[in-house]
Structures are given as structure tokens and as C-alpha cells.
From Swiss-Prot:
Highest classification ranks of the organism: Eukaryota, Metazoa, Chordata, Craniata, Vertebrata
Gene3D superfamilies assigned to the protein according to its UniProt record, in alphabetical order: 2.60.120.920, P-loop containing nucleotide triphosphate hydrolases, SAP domain
UniProt biased composition (Basic and acidic residues): 148-163, 185-223, 627-639
Subcellular compartments: Nucleus
Phosphoserine: modified positions: 161, 168, 185, 188, 226, 228
Name used for this protein in its record: Heterogeneous nuclear ribonucleoprotein U-like protein 2
Domain SAP intervals: 3-37
Regions of compositional bias (Acidic residues) in chain numbering: 73-97, 232-242
Summary of subunit composition and partner proteins: Binds to MLF1 and retains it in the nucleus.
Gene: HNRNPUL2
Domain B30.2/SPRY: 226-419
Length: 747
């Protein structure tokens, strides 16, 4: 096993198999594994060659790529190893230490082959993390999420390459992972007499909470090794549809809501991966008068992973255009929840009955009374009026059918069916039967994806990116921007109800982690959807900016940089901490500062603007942040080792490439090096004196002539035996000649 050629994930897998600590940077892991292999070798020799704990785990040597002689290959190698260190750092912060074993007992290797273990470790970088346990079942009207989350869902890794693009920026000085029991109490040390820098230790918080910025940084590191993003899938061509039909609107629906082909139903796209995620859609038409109804049926509860405590729920009702996608959690948004609750503007009250799989809910809107009345029915049974809406406050806004579901499949009847699930009350008509001129159509999506635009936010945590994005989207309603950010996804993952008990730290941390993972998938879906988007993330790394914007190849791509002055930024960070209850880890903040650079207009950035301070004012602040962070981040010893190894490799390449000049081999004495290396008086003796010192011993042992007569009789006897064998076994001789002499070799 060549330890130096193993990747971080492979090193971790081998260490875990032996019950050893798998935390640390690559150089530490390699040293730890090499010591374990040496110990096993000594045990084998002492015990007569018995197999040790790692005896059966001989990894196949990985092919060594030809090292380029130019600077580009060196930069890519640096970036690859630095990114492995970055991933190792992030994994260490989440990794639980292995269970302590009895003294003197060896760890039992798993039954699976080492190749499979290495592949599994490489495919799942977070495999060492332990899932959070759910603390309670699904009892109560608020479902199972209020007491705790289900099993942890690991993000499906994408195929990644081992190197980064030359144009991307990778952290220059990575902090070394500190080991030992005293890591929580030891603090940064000031520079001593030898001039060493003050270091900020990377360590796991005792609260096991990280916050949005940490997991956003983690996702960025997870995807940062792709040379270039996969090209977006070709969008299916829209067939000519009857624009007078009432069906689900794919332009305003959630990206993670999978609308059926006939657009009269749908289901969540990530129900198995993210079971806490709500998703839904509105209809293409709304109404402002008359007595109108529609039906919604829960056709199926989607299966969930074993141990998941989440429940399947449907919320159905009415909402106005431009309201939030979470039905019942915004003004002029009214929903009836499967837990027997009604919701309006985020306020929940008990109403009607609970409902679930195979139940049909009728939704009725009566505009002919003094106030607009919204009522519901279950399987044809009237449940009464749930909401009364003032016509003055509603004004001329139209009410649109709206569904929101979690882990279930919903089917809608707007009147397109020949027969309804249940007959509606007298004088009520399905919305599809309302004349087209009396309906209100929602916005029509762009005809081509070239008409769409994407805005990439760039800035440190707490700089005000989200506020800028929400304000800009509100000021430009005709664009209908979809703001994709961790906070947006978190709102769609939180369960609201009559009571909202606080989640335990582990469950809250897991929810934030899942939101970051879900956001990465939504960005990929957005790149092939005809809408306008604002990517509300930090995006301080050039590699992350490039990777995301290249996904939106046919969009109009803009970048907005938000850099406030230092005083405002500190105030916003404090306010962010008060509102969200978490702080940005210092090590993550330093990494972001050290690698924050202002983007420039290029082939994948059509426009770069500044949301607060202009570039001339922002540049000195960013430069100051970089310098301060790099002073606090400890230097990486690994970087120095790599540079020395690279110089050694370059010397070897030069000697191979310049070994022959003019058809004659150049000797050591002809090398273009200083005379001090070739044994001049007063110097170290050099290579030539060292070589001559042992030349005599070499010649005495290896320089002897071969004595043929001494071994002639020995070989002659074996030759007779083989001839006799082939004489009595001609079939073997023929097979031997065919296999050996029949092969013609390379031509």
C-alpha cells in the first residue's frame, strides 16, 4: 500500500478500519496510517507471518499522472491538495471520535472488501458523521417535526474531479487541525521570538451548532473541485397548450414541486431526501366574483426512509398573486391543513377535521356575500366557513387556488373532469367553468430562456445581501425574481402549527445543514428553468462564482457585490446573531476574508455592480480583511513540503529531458551546476567523492564475471527434464508455443 498516493477519504477509511483516529489533515492521516502499517508488519514478522488487522487490505496502486513541467500543472496540484485539506477540515468539525476500545484489543475489520470501503468513503465525504436521532414520534396536531427531526439525509455526491480550474481561487494558507484533549481550552498563542504567526485553532463547538454560514461554506468546499459544471440538461420544448385552461402554473410554482404532465396534480421532488420540505403551486387563473370551487385529493402518501418521523400533509386553499409560496403564512393567503387546522397570515387555529390519504377536500369561495367567505368540505361533508375577508382590504386582487404538500401526491379537479369527486353545493361552479373574460390570468413566463437573468450576490456573512435581494425583487415585480437562499429554504422546511416548541440544538443544526444541501440542488434546477433568479449566498470564492454562473450559460448573468463599511458590518453581524441565534465560526469567517476578492467583468459575468460601497471604497476594506485574516491563519507546513517535492520532481524532469545532447549522454561532470558539488577542495566532498568511496565494494561484489562452466551441469539437467516432459505431453508444448510465439507484439 502506497500511503502517499491515497486520497483523504481513502486514508480515513483505512484508519477507521483499524479503529484509529481519522481526524486531521492529509499529512497527519498519512503519517498515522504509515505507523499503523509498520506496526502490523512487525507483528507479522514476530508472529510467523500471520495476518494483522490490515493484512487483507492491500489497496491497488493508483495510476500516477504524468506531471507537467509547466506552472499550470503545479498550480492544479496545489489546488487539489489544498481542497483535500479544506474538506478534511470540514469533516473533522463534524466527525465524532471513534468509540473507545478496550486496551490491547485490536479493531475488527469490516467484512466488506477494502476496495468497496474506499469507494464508499470517496463517494460520501460525510460518511463519518453520525445521524441525529429523532427525539419523539409524530403525535400531536403539529406532526412529528416539532419534537425532532428524522434520520439524517446524506447529500448525493456529484461526480467531481481532483483539480480546480486555474482561474479559481483556493485558500492559500489552510489552518492545521489541532489534536488532543486540550483543544477546547487552548487558545491562540501570540507570536514568539521565532516570529511564528498567531493561529486560530479549528475546533468543534461544544454546542454542536454551526449556523447557515458554516454549512454554506461547507457546500462551497464540497462542490469546489469540479473543473467545470456539468452542462444543464436541455429543457423540454413546451408543447402548444390551450391558454384558456385552468391548471397548475409552472412559472410561479416551487422549483422542488414536480407538476404532473397534465398539470392537474403534483408531488414534492425531494420528499425522500428532504422529508421536512414543503412544496406547492397555484393555478394559472384566479377569480374576483361569483361562487367558485375546486377539489383536491390526496391520492398517495409517499414512502419515507425507515425511522423517519415526518408525516404526510396537505394544505389547500386560496391565495393572491405575489404572496409567499407557504400557503396560509402570508397576508391574503388562506389554507386548510390536514392536521385539522386553518392558517391565515401565519396564525393557526383548529378547524374542521383531520384528513389524509384518499380524502377529497372541497374549497369554496363566495364573493356574493357582504364579505368574501371561504369554506371547505371533506368527502362531500360541509365543514363550514373558515375565513371571512373584507372586500375593501382585498380590493381588486384575485383569489387563486393554491395547494401545499409534504410527502404526498395531490390531484386537483378544476372542473376538467366529466364527473367531480363529490357534487358541489348549489350555485357553486368549478373555476374552469367560469368564462375566460371573468377570470384573472397570472403572469406569462418568458418564451425563451435567453430572456431570463440571474443575479449572483457576493459578500461576507451579515453584509446585507438578503435585504438587498428582497428589496430589489419587491421593486421589480414584473421580473418575478425567485430568491434562492438558505433562509428561503429554511422557511419551507419549518413546521408551523398551534404550538411551536423550540427544537433541540442537534435538530436545528441538522435542519440548517439540509437547507444548504437542498439549496445546492435548487440552483442546478434553476439553471434550466425559464425564470429570473437571485442567488442569495456569500459566493466570496472565485471558483464558486465561476461554477454557478457557468450553469446559467444562456441567461443574462449579473453580479452584485455588497461591501458595507466596517462599523455597519459589525452592527449587522450582531443583529444577525440576535435574530438567527447563531454566530459565524471564527475559522470560517477568517477563511472567507482571506479568499474574498472583488469580481471583475469577464466572459461569464455580463455585469458587475456594487449594492452599497462602490469599488473604489470597497477595495481597501477587502484588502484589509485579507491581510488581517492571513496573519491570523497559521501557515501550512504541507504547502512547504509540496513545494520542496515539486522542485525535486522538476529537477528529475530536467535530468530526463536533457540527458542526451547531440546523440551523446552527458556525464555527471558535465552538468551545468557549480563546481562546489563536484568535490572541489575545501567543500563538502560532493557527489563524486561520495560515489568513489563505495565504488570498490560495488565492483568486488557485482563486477565479477559470470562463470558459465560452474553452472553448466546444473542447467543441463533441467533442460533434459523439460525436453522429456514435452516429448510425452505434446499438447502442452503446442499450447505453450501458440500462446508465446503466436503473440506478435507491438508493430
Amino acid at each position: 500500500m502506497e500511503v502517499k498516493r491515497l486520497k483523504v477519504t481513502e486514508l480515513r477509511s483505512e484508519l477507521q478500519r483499524r479503529g484509529l483516529d481519522s481526524r486531521g489533515l492529509k499529512v497527519d492521516l498519512a503519517q498515522r496510517l504509515q505507523e499503523a502499517l509498520d506496526a502490523e508488519m512487525l507483528e507479522d514478522e514476530a508472529g510467523g507471518g500471520g495476518a494483522g488487522p490490515g493484512g487483507a487490505c492491500k489497496a491497488e496502486p493508483r495510476p500516477v499522472a504524468a506531471s507537467g513541467g509547466g506552472p499550470g500543472g503545479d498550480e492544479e496540484e496545489d489546488e487539489e491538495e489544498e481542497e483535500e485539506d479544506e474538506e478534511a477540515l470540514l469533516e473533522d468539525e463534524d466527525e465524532e471520535p471513534p468509540p473507545a476500545q478496550a486496551l490491547g484489543q485490536a479493531a475488527q475489520p469490516p467484512p466488506e472488501p477494502p476496495e468497496a470501503a474506499a469507494m464508499e468513503a470517496a463517494a460520501e465525504p460525510d460518511a463519518s458523521e453520525k445521524p441525529a436521532e429523532a427525539t419523539a414520534g409524530s403525535g400531536g396536531v403539529n406532526g412529528g417535526e416539532e419534537q425532532g427531526l428524522g434520520k439524517r439525509e446524506e447529500d448525493e455526491p456529484e461526480e467531481r474531479s481532483g483539480d480546480e480550474t486555474p482561474g479559481s481561487e483556493v485558500p492559500g494558507d489552510k489552518a492545521a487541525e489541532e489534536q488532543g484533549d486540550d483543544q477546547d481550552s487552548e487558545k491562540s498563542k501570540p507570536a514568539g521570538s521565532d516570529g511564528e504567526r498567531r493561529g486560530v485553532k479549528r475546533q468543534r463547538d461544544e454546542k454542536d451548532e454551526h449556523g447557515r454560514a458554516y454549512y454554506e461554506f461547507r457546500e462551497e468546499a464540497y462542490h469546489s473541485r469540479s473543473k467545470s459544471p456539468l452542462p444543464p440538461e436541455e429543457e423540454a420544448k413546451d408543447e402548444e397548450e390551450d391558454q384558456t385552461l385552468v391548471n397548475l402554473d409552472t412559472y410561479t410554482s416551487d422549483l422542488h414541486f414536480q407538476v404532473s404532465k397534465d398539470r392537474y396534480g403534483g408531488q414534492p421532488l425531494f420528499s425522500e431526501k428532504f422529508p421536512t420540505l414543503w412544496s406547492g403551486a397555484r393555478s394559472t387563473y384566479g377569480v374576483t366574483k361569483g361562487k367558485v370551487c375546486f377539489e383536491a385529493k390526496v391520492t398517495q402518501n409517499l414512502p419515507m426512509k425507515e425511522g423517519c418521523t415526518e408525516v404526510s400533509l396537505l394544505r389547500v386553499g386560496w391565495s393572491v398573486d405575489f404572496s409567499r409560496p407557504q400557503l396560509g403564512e402570508d397576508e391574503f393567503s388562506y389554507g386548510f391543513d390536514g392536521r385539522g387546522l386553518k392558517a391565515e397570515n401565519g396564525q393557526f387555529e383548529e378547524f374542521g377535521q383531520t384528513f389524509g390519504e384518499n380524502d377529497v377536500i372541497g374549497c369554496f369561495a363566495n364573493f356574493e356575500t357582504e364579505e368574501v367567505e371561504l369554506s371547505f368540505s371533506k368527502n362531500g361533508e360541509d365543514l363550514g366557513v373558515a375565513f371571512w375577508i373584507s372586500k375593501d382590504s382585498l380590493a381588486d386582487r384575485a383569489l387563486l387556488p393554491h395547494v401545499l404538500c409534504k410527502n404526498c401526491v395531490v390531484e386537483l379537479n378544476f372542473g376538467q373532469k366529466e364527473e367531480p369527486f363529490f357534487p358541489p353545493p348549489e350555485e357553486f361552479v368549478f373555476i374552469h367553468a367560469v368564462p375566460v373574460e371573468e377570470r384573472v390570468r397570472t403572469a406569462v413566463p418568458p418564451k425563451t430562456i435567453e430572456e431570463c437573468e440571474v443575479i449572483l450576490m457576493v459578500g461576507l456573512p451579515g453584509s446585507g445581501k438578503t435585504q438587498w435581494a428582497l428589496k430589489y425583487a419587491k421593486e421589480n415585480p414584473e421580473k418575478r425574481y425567485n430568491v434562492l437562499g438558505a433562509e428561503t429554504v429554511l422557511n419551507q422546511m419549518r413546521m408551523k402549527g398551534l404550538e411551536e416548541p423550540e427544537m433541540d440544538p442537534k435538530s436545528r443544526d441538522l435542519l440548517v445543514q439540509q437547507a444548504s444541501q437542498c439549496l445546492s440542488k435548487l440552483v442546478q434546477i434553476a439553471s434550466r428553468t425559464k425564470r429570473n433568479f437571485i442567488l442569495d449566498q456569500c459566493n466570496v470564492y472565485n471558483s464558486g462564482q465561476r461554477r454557478k454562473l457557468l450553469l446559467f450559460k444562456t441567461f443574462s448573468r449579473k453580479v452584485v457585490v455588497v461591501v458595507p463599511n466596517e462599523e455597519d458590518w459589525k452592527k449587522r453581524l450582531e443583529l444577525r446573531k440576535e435574530v438567527e441565534g447563531d454566530d459565524v465560526p471564527e475559522s470560517i469567517m477568517l477563511e472567507m476574508k482571506a479568499n474574498f476578492s472583488l469580481p471583475e467583468k469577464c466572459d461569464y459575468m455580463d455585469e458587475v455592480t456594487y449594492g452599497e460601497l462602490e469599488k473604489e471604497e470597497a477595495q481597501p476594506i477587502v484588502t484589509k480583511y485579507k491581510e488581517e485574516a492571513r496573519k491570523l491563519l497559521p501557515p501550512s507546513e504541507k504547502r512547504t513540503n509540496r513545494r520542496n517535492n515539486r522542485n525535486k520532481r522538476n529537477r528529475q524532469n530536467r535530468s530526463r529531458g536533457q540527458g542526451y545532447v547531440g546523440g551523446q549522454r552527458r556525464g555527471y561532470d558535465n552538468r551545468a551546476y557549480g563546481q562546489q558539488y563536484w568535490g572541489q577542495p575545501g567543500n563538502r566532498g560532493g557527489y563524486r567523492n561520495f560515489y568513489d568511496r563505495y565504488r570498490g565494494d560495488y565492483d568486488r561484489f557485482y563486477g565479477r564475471d559470470y562463470e558459465y562452466n560452474r553452472y553448466r551441469d546444473y542447467y543441463r539437467q533441467y533442460n533434459r527434464d523439460w525436453q522429456s516432459y514435452y516429448y510425452h505431453h505434446p499438447q502442452d508444448r503446442d499450447r505453450y508455443y501458440r500462446n508465446y510465439y503466436g503473440y506478435q507484439g507491438y508493430r
